[in-house]
Design a protein with these regions (language model features):
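Cofactor-/ligand-binding subdomain signature composed of acidic, glycine-rich
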Residues: 1-40
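Glycine-rich phosphate-binding loops that contact phosphosugars or nucleotide phosphates
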Residues: 66-204, 212-214
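EF-Ts-like protein-protein interaction surfaces
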Residues: 191-201, 205, 228-241
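Short, amphipathic alpha-helical interaction segments embedded in low-complexity terminal/linker regions
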Residues: 212-298
Length: 298
């Protein structure tokens, strides 16, 4: 294996003397390199949009979004998955993050797990992965066996397969139905893909899950109307969302939320249409959970 041909493993000439720099110069240089990430992700907008549409369509049909990755890439997938239930009230099994080596690998590296191609497929089998689901394989280098094993298995099931890597021409790119390949260049510390590559992957994952949830009607304007208020901060956010969406005062928003079990969507429809809880629920159901349509704005 020639790692020199992999962009994420190449040496960054701009940071070759970073160990001799002052702390301020070092930090500024890292920041300058990080600025390349957003542009690299932006260059993949068309592919990201295609992936969002596929994910939203499959979730609407009862499929699941499954991330597969190793190390940093795997942890980023897990992070994105676990944030979906509180943010968008998704079922915990609707967006799933799989990491080579299992849950222990989230906190401590499991040596050799990423090199097991069969394990990638086996982890999909364990969750009953099928044709309605979508797999997103995440690997900075684009060559990780665990991820490729998962991607190949998913393709055999007839599922949509999306690949995220930071190395053009990689095996992940070739295996994916939709390849997303932001290329921010060699890392500040050679081969440390938790840095620019990891940031690029996190940005892409944000777009995939957020974009899909917006397409599914879980956002009204730019308000998080499907938030699950599981703590004090989120309860207050829920109240502010209803106030922002309807123009009512804090007490009126609180009263409406208490009537409908703190479901912001239902409270907004109630207040905007003068309906009771049951009628608001029916309006939302008739319009696939989209608040704008439920209140007659679109």
């Amino acid at each position: 294996m020639d790692l020199n041909s992999i962009k994420t493993e190449q040496r960054n000439s701009r940071t070759a003397q970073i160990d001799t720099m002052s702390t301020l110069s070092m930090v500024k240089l890292i920041s300058e390199e990080d600025k390349k990430v957003a542009a690299a992700v932006g260059a993949e907008a068309e592919h990201i949009a295609q992936a969002v549409d596929v994910i939203a369509a499959q979730l609407k049909q009862g499929g699941r979004l499954v991330y597969s990755g190793c190390g940093t890439s795997g942890r980023l997938g897990v992070l994105d998955a676990v944030e979906c239930p509180p943010t968008y009230s998704t079922d915990p099994g609707e967006v799933i993050g799989l990491i080579a080596g299992g849950n222990e690998a989230i906190f401590r590296a499991k040596e050799g797990a990423e090199d097991d191609e069969a394990l990638g497929a086996e982890d999909l089998k364990k969750i009953g992965f099928g044709s309605k689901d979508v797999l997103v394989g995440i690997a900075a280098s684009g060559r990780t066996p665990y991820v490729l094993g998962a991607m190949n298995y998913a393709r055999k099931q007839g599922a949509h397969v999306i690949g995220i890597s930071c190395n053009p021409g990689s095996q992940v790119e070739k295996t994916a139905e939709i390849a997303i390949t932001p290329t921010p260049g060699p890392e500040v510390v050679t081969g440390s893909t938790r840095m620019k590559s990891g940031t690029a992957q996190k940005m892409v994952l944000n777009m995939l899950s957020t974009g899909a949830m917006i397409k599914l009607g879980k956002v009204y304007g730019n308000l998080m109307v499907d938030v699950k208020p599981t703590n004090a901060k989120l309860v207050e956010r829920c109240k502010r969302i209803v106030c922002e969406a309807t123009g009512v005062d804090y007490d009126t928003a609180t009263e409406a939320l208490e009537k409908c079990g703190y479901r912001a969507k239902v409270a907004i429809v109630m207040l905007k249409t003068g309906s009771d809880v049951h009628e608001a629920e029916q309006r939302l159901e008739a319009h696939e959970g989209r608040v704008a349509q439920a209140v007659g704005e679109n």
